[in-house]
């Protein structure tokens, strides 16, 4: 089971996930949305497409752009559609 934890709070947990370039992507339904707020940050990957970000909020602390997703991934990255990945201090274990 994969798990994402930040500031002592489980943000996502799932037995099913996708691993791309060493990052674990959690299915949307496994993510605790109450800890996420949309960010205006975007980035672009030549083979995955345009990423969007979430800022994570736990116990009054924020972790800007700590989660990302591809709302409309390119065909080669179709497996990560409806999935979210983490970085910036979020501990992810497979």
Language-model segments: residues:
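Terminal leader/tail segments of proteins
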Residues: 1-94
């Amino acid at each position: 089971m994969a798990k994402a934890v930040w500031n002592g709070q489980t943000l996502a947990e799932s037995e099913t996930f996708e691993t791309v370039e060493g990052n674990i992507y959690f299915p949307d339904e496994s993510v605790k949305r109450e800890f996420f707020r949309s960010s205006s940050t975007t980035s672009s990957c030549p083979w995955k497409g345009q990423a969007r970000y979430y800022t994570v909020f736990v116990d009054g602390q924020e972790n800007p752009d700590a989660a990302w997703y591809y709302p409309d991934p390119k065909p080669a990255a179709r497996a990560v559609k409806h999935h979210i990945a983490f970085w910036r201090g979020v501990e992810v274990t497979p």
